[in-house]
Each structure stands twice: as C-alpha cells, then as structure tokens.
Amino acid sequence: MGPVGAEADENQTVEVKVEPYGPGHTTPRGELPPDPEPELIDSTKLVEVQVILILAYCSIILLGVVGNSLVIHVVIKFKSMRTVTNFFIANLAVADLLVNTLCLPFTLTYTLMGEWKMGPVLCHLVPYAQGLAVQVSTITLTVIALDRHRCIVYHLESKISKRISFLIIGLAWGISALLASPLAIFREYSLIEIIPDFEIVACTEKWPGEEKSVYGTVYSLSTLLILYVLPLGIISFSYTRIWSKLRNHVSPGAASDHYHQRRHKMTKMLVCVVVVFAVSWLPLHAFQLAVDIDSHVLDLKEYKLIFTVFHIIAMCSTFANPLLYGWMNSNYRKAFLSAFRCEQRLDAIHSEVSMTFKAKKNLEVKKNNGPTDSFSEATNV
C-alpha cells in the first residue's frame, strides 16, 4: 500500500475532503491544474465564428442601408419616379431600412455578448421593431403583386391613385403595428441564474397564464401563417397569372420587339421575387416551427448558432429587395446613376416608347377599341 494506507487502520473510514482548484489556483505542489473541459461549448463564442458573424451582419447592414436609402432617395427626388408602384417599393425600402438600422446591430451585439446589455427599453423595442418591419415588408410585397396583377391581367387603365396608395401604406403599418404588439407587450427583462452565483441579463418572451408555452406557440404558428404561407400563396398566384399573361400576349406594331424583351425581363424579375422571398425566410420559419412542435430542439448543442445562421439568411432579403425591385428595372438604373451624378432632373427612360404607344392607341381605339395601350403602360414601372 501507499503511504496513506500504511498510516490508516484497515477498518477505519478515512474521510478525504477534496478542494477544487480553479483557474489561477495552485495545487499543494505549486502546479497549475488544467482547465476543466466544458460540457457544452457555444460556437458563437469562438473568435473565428464571431468574425464571420460580424462580417455577415455588417455586410447586410451596409448593403441594406445603401440600397434602401438609394431607392427612397430617387423616388422622393425625381418626379417621374413618383408612381404608385414606386411608392410601394419605397415603403418596402423603409421597412427594410428599419431592420438594417435598428434591429440588426442590436441582434449582432446580443449574439456576440451572450446576454442583453442594452437595457429594458430596447428589450421591448427591438423585437417589436423587427416584427413590425417584417410584417410591413410582407404586406407591401403582397400589395405590389396584387397591384401588378390588377393592372396587367385585367388591362385596367385607371390605376390606384396616389392618395389611395398612401392610405394602403398607412393601413399596412397600422395592421403590422397591431399584429406585432405581442412582441413588445409579452417581453421580460430579467436576470437568469445559469449556475450558482452566476447570472446573466436576458430579454425573453413572457406569456401570461399557466400554460405560457401554449400562447407562445399559438402566436408563432399564427405569425407563420400570416407572414409566410398566406402571402407566399397570394404572391405566387398573382405572379403566375402575370407571367402567363405576359407570355401569351402579342404586341402589334413596330415596338413589339421592345416589349417582347421587356416581357422576358419582367418575368425573370417576378420569378426572382417569389424565389428570394420563399428561400430566404424558409429556413428560419421551418426552424421556429420545429421549436414549437418539439421544445427539445432548444436543447440542441448548436441551437444558438443554427438560429443565427438562419436569421442571417432571412435578413439577406433586406438588401436583395432593392436589387430585385430597383436595379433590375431600367428606370431605377437610370435614376441611380442620376443620383450619383447629382443631377436634378430625370427624363423618363421610356418616354419615346410611351409616346409611340399613345399615338398607336388613338388609332387602335378608332379601329377596334383594343386594350393594347393599357397593357403596355401596365408593364412600365
């Protein structure tokens, strides 16, 4: 036996008290004990992961702020850009800009620090602002699709007036503010004890009643239906009919080749709109649905990292929208260039073509009262 066994009686129970040695403490022999291996490692605390997250969020913020600000600027500055469709696009840009400036910086900070250091006011405000902006964006995307469907499929010459468009925009914000209000009301800013004598400041949902999880699940599923499934169905239906109408339409006259090209460009843009909207939000919504169905998903080792990655993918739509609705349109391209050159006026890029079709309309109305011009005007933004 060793030295300890030699000094102790065989039938005597020896109680040995072991004192833990933390980092920086030495053993009786003056040695530093090895750091204990943690049972659960948060990947978002790794330096290389944090660098990637910072680059990703900063890129989204930069592209979103520049792109959305530019869209808003050209719609306000140039009179020829002040159309109903462009007002809706500018409203979409405002909502995305709200996410880029108010939500994403604090979301990044919360992810990197692991606790909420921004105080109780922002604890209630940031989630509400993000929910508000996302719902405004979704409603605006749906309104744009329905407006384009109304103009192109049904050849309606009398478009929505500017006054009505502002009313629709106001209703979109009002409805969204109401739908997002639970995110601000049922919120709690509190201290959470992770381990004894170690607390963190958290900003979490706090639903009323004994069955708190039920209320949260109902709201989450309702949001999924209202913000994703229903709008995606409406948008897909509208753009499918628009694409079919554009594909089957034949433009008579000398400018038919021009509108044949614009037809394919518009079809491509509309398909991109639906794909980006569906793909960017699908992972986050699917993951949230999995959490609602099975709460054990919260216990996943990399839950925080998975959620963050899906959130980044969803937020990519905030800078993709200006590209899809703005940069792929020739009028917006010219407006962007004029803004960079500090030009004070912007001539309509399709003015000559529009005049040609207006002249053709006068002749065609006399002959067969055809709807060609209403269709051609509807294809211009």
From Swiss-Prot:
Coiled coil: none annotated. It comes from the Eukaryota. One of its GO terms (biological process) is negative regulation of feeding behavior. Keywords: Cell membrane, Disulfide bond, G-protein coupled receptor, Glycoprotein, Lipoprotein, Membrane, Palmitate, Receptor, Transducer, Transmembrane, Transmembrane helix. Residues 1-37 are annotated as: Disordered. It is a multi-pass membrane protein. Disulfide bonds join 123-203. InterPro entries: GPCR_Rhodpsn (IPR000276), GPCR_Rhodpsn_7TM (IPR017452), NPY2_rcpt (IPR001358), NPY_rcpt (IPR000611). SMART domains: 7TM_GPCR_Srsx. GO terms for molecular function: neuropeptide Y receptor activity; peptide YY receptor activity. Glycans are attached at residue 11. Residues 1-51, 108-124, 187-216, 290-304 are extracellular. The chain crosses the membrane at residues 52-72, 87-107, 125-145, 166-186, 217-237, 269-289, 305-325. Residues 73-86, 146-165, 238-268, 326-381 are cytoplasmic. It is found in: Cell membrane. CDD domains: 7tmA_NPY2R. A lipid is attached at residue 342 (S-palmitoyl cysteine). GO terms for cellular component: cilium; glutamatergic synapse; non-motile cilium; plasma membrane; presynapse. Belongs to the G-protein coupled receptor 1 family. Receptor for neuropeptide Y and peptide YY. This is Neuropeptide Y receptor type 2. The gene is Npy2r.
